[in-house]
């Protein structure tokens, strides 16, 4: 427990942390308990209200971790490096177009360029690709702020997706939902096959609540924000996690963690810092 205290003393005055044990403890807590990357941990401290005597850069923090100065190790850090590509069979590569919805080619340029709020990407995180009847997470990522909404569904079917959006619309109200969810971009998975059900308002008869666009097959980069968000979710629910044993409360905690996580692409601000002021004005 006191190993890094001894390491601090052994390193001598050249260790910038010096005797600022409170700062060291705050960094350890963010990295080990809250699962932040070193850069995100430093940003969270800068964004916070509490001030410390010391301030270090990411490279210094990584060196401290590598040299055992702090009570955290490399295993506490997010995995880095490229993952091995799976050698997919021909059967896996063929993805049938399951909808007659609107192609991403017709999506407005302002959505592509992320110049305005209200445009989302949607995906699912699940336990088994083969079993569509197991509990699934519906993941929505706002393209401008990277704000995350995660909804636990009973299965990975188009009916459950429509029901989840209906519940979200009822909780917000029809007018606010239409402002917040102006467009939603999805892949060609069968859970997103009911584009009419997803677009149609549950509260206003014969009126649309959003516009759904479909990506090209095998182009996950067209939902890049979704893909990155899914990696953050997998820090908490690794592949193979039985989502039937994951509670709604646990899902909500992960959603909050993601939205409070400082991101490099946001200038080390959090999604909540960027999204909430806009959302509250709608």
Regions found by a protein language model. Give the residues of each.
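Short, basic alpha-helical/linker "hinge" immediately adjacent to a nucleic-acid-recognition surface
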Residues: 1-33
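Mobile genetic element proteins and their domesticated derivatives, centered on retroelements
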Residues: 27, 41, 61, 123, ...
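DNA-recognition alpha helix
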Residues: 38-52
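An active-site-proximal beta-strand-loop segment
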Residues: 106-149
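Active-site beta-loop-alpha junctions of metal-dependent nucleic acid enzymes
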Residues: 130-133, 150-175
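Acidic/histidine-rich, metal-coordinating catalytic segments
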Residues: 175-194, 216-218
């Amino acid at each position: 427990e006191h190993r890094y205290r001894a390491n601090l003393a052994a390193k001598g005055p050249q260790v910038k942390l010096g005797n600022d044990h409170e700062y060291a403890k705050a960094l350890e807590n963010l990295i080990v308990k809250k699962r932040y990357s070193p850069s995100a941990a430093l940003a969270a401290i800068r964004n916070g209200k509490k001030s410390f005597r010391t301030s270090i850069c990411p490279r210094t923090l990584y060196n401290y971790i590598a040299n055992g100065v702090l009570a955290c190790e490399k295993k506490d850090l997010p995995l880095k490096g490229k993952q091995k590509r799976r050698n997919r069979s021909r059967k896996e590569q063929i993805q049938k177009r399951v909808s007659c919805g609107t192609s991403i080619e017709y999506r407005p340029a302002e959505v592509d360029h992320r110049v305005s709020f209200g445009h989302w990407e949607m995906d699912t995180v699940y336990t088994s690709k083969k079993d569509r009847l197991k509990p699934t997470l519906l993941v929505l990522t706002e393209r401008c702020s990277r704000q995350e909404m995660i909804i636990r569904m009973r299965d990975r079917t188009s009916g459950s997706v429509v029901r989840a959006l209906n519940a979200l619309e009822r909780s917000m109200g029809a007018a606010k939902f239409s402002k917040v969810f102006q467009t939603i971009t999805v892949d060609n998975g069968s859970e997103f096959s009911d584009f009419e059900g997803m677009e149609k308002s549950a509260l206003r008869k014969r009126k649309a609540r959003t516009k759904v666009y479909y990506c090209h097959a095998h182009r996950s980069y067209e939902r890049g924000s979704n893909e990155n968000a899914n990696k953050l979710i997998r820090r908490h629910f690794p592949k193979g996690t039985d989502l039937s044993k994951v509670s709604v409360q646990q899902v909500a905690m992960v959603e909050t963690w993601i939205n409070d996580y400082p991101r490099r692409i946001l200038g080390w601000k959090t999604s909540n810092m960027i999204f909430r002021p806009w959302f509250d004005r709608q």
